[in-house]
């Protein structure tokens, strides 16, 4: 519900007079809340708060105590594995890391792959977590990667609403590149 809808409901119920100081104050509070909600949906990178198992995964420490070159996040269904992976990838692509980040940091742009079993699964799961719901222009850039850091996209011609690659603005001023791949096409 938008602030204007909520305000109209309040006025219609005659709880507040449109001209009262309280009404003006309520309108301002609702406007600030709407701006906050919009910002939060636009910058998921900033609001991600990992669970302890996700935080440990992000630390990327090997059994020997050094930096792990390969990792596997195994957990139950629907507990945030894909989401945490998308958040980590967005940090690496952009170079913008949260204060709590203890894992590896890329100070230069990177070249990365996000791969799934098929192009359709890659689109429906990985692309959705990183860019927003496939085919929904309003939701594009309201996922792990914010719209203002997406420089360019290249469509996957064989799959509706799928991208083959995305260019992402890195903190260094240069650009990272993300490719969407599928295992069934041989990567």
Where in this protein do the model-derived segments appear?
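Phosphate/NTP-binding elements of NTP-utilizing enzymes
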Residues: 1-187
């Amino acid at each position: 519900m938008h602030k204007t809808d909520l305000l109209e409901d309040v006025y219609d119920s005659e709880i507040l007079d449109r001209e009262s100081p309280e009404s003006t104050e309520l309108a301002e509070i609702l406007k600030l809340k709407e701006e906050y909600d919009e910002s939060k949906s636009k910058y998921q990178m900033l609001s991600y708060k990992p669970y302890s198992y996700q935080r440990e995964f992000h630390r990327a420490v090997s059994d020997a105590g050094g930096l792990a070159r390969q990792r596997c996040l195994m957990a139950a269904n629907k507990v945030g594995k894909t989401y945490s992976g998308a958040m980590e990838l967005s940090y690496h692509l952009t170079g913008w890391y949260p204060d709590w980040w203890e894992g590896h940091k890329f100070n230069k742009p990177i070249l990365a792959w996000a791969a799934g079993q098929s192009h359709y699964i890659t689109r429906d799961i990985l692309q959705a977590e990183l860019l927003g719901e496939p085919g929904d222009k309003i939701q594009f850039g309201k996922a792990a990667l914010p719209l203002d850091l997406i420089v360019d996209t290249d469509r996957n011609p064989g799959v509706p609403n799928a991208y083959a690659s995305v260019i992402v603005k890195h903190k260094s001023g240069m650009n990272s590149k993300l490719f969407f791949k599928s295992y069934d096409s041989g990567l």
